[in-house]
Amino acid sequence: MSTEQMGTYEKIYFALWELGQRYGNFVQFRVIGRSHDDRMIPMLEIGKGDTCIICLSGVESGDRNLPEYLLSIAKDYCRSYESNWTIGESYEVRKLLDKVRICMIPMLNPDSYEICEYGYGAIHNPIHRQMLKMQDRPVEEYECNARGIDLRRNFPTNYYQRKRVNQEPASENETRALISIFQELSLIHIS
């Protein structure tokens, strides 16, 4: 996918919201939290089942293409459910999504996504913006949130290692939002 084809945070957010509005009888759009730079973290639930499959991307900017791909997959599932399509010879989308839900979180870390797209100037908070500029890290290589924390290493595990003063496991809004979803939903698979 070329850079011209990629969506901005706002485009992806509103495309997910529109899917929730259009297919409201089997799709739910919701905000699961806010980033440290006050961007909303969207999630789209497709299907009616109690058990949930979570599809997660956008944890860091290296996932640059994945949010757009998840959005495309979400659109395909919505159209397939509404039209009662069968994929291949035996994959009945409606039958599947009446038993399980696919919960898509295409952009857990919208701040990193925006930094990669627009540079450190995309950060609204002047203190965070200046702190990030002082790290002298190229925006193309940036993988953290607006506070400079790598979310991949912010989960409370037995192997957690503190990298900075005042950094604790699950110290970040984005991490806490995902943990909250894990605790709320009955999961069968995380991809």
Spell out what each predicted region is.
Residues 43-50:
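Short beta-strand-to-loop junctions in surface cap/lid or active-site-entrance loops
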Residues 1-37:
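Short glycine- and acidic-rich boundary segments immediately preceding or forming the N-terminal edge
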Residues 52-55:
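Conserved beta-strand elements of the Class I
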Residues 58-60, 189-191:
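Histidine-centered divalent metal-coordination motifs
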